[in-house]
């Protein structure tokens, strides 16, 4: 299947040159890393990031911090496992798919072999295109990856995993099997957990709640993430993808996590009464 983008022209520009200008702005923005990716690194081990998925004008500079780190730690052929929440309610509880996703920068191929192996080994995972057709949380990550590819930093294939079910046990299962299949197939991989943090709360409230979950992520405490989200009613849309990413990364040997940047939509709109929180976090 060839999937067409559904939020190009809304969350990010649909035209090639306008999108390139926007991506470069995200890197060079005062809220971004303030420099463009310029060199490929040496891949020594898997890398995980937490990355936001709002409109680029709001969260793109935050996301750029994570992709800058990716560029410094990869080379050659890399499979990007991208986990995102299901906002649409379409399709199955946990799903991947095979095929190609179109972007304004060109086509991105799914690692069909990895997706098929993961589907066959992980009982909670379905092959289901419907979950992905109108979901934006994975799509908005692809232009950043394709941009790195166009800079000859790496050659990417990806595996989309859309999570409507985000309970703790299911999320841990997904993470376990990602790591298992990655080891079995000896792939160079990065794992991207797509999530925004608190939604439509005051800057003070959102920052305070988000700090609780960010602390858990930095300490690689997967169960505490789930507990804090539930206990403190934190409206983080992709806690399941984050838990799955951390489980997979720990199984692949990760020991450290660093907060690269935190910001809110209020830092753009200057309206701090109702904001959405965004964080870029590195796990390795």
Swiss-Prot record:
InterPro entries associated with the record: MEMO1_fam
Protein family: Belongs to the MEMO1 family.
Entry-linked PANTHER family: PROTEIN MEMO1
Protein name: MEMO1 family protein MmarC5_0191
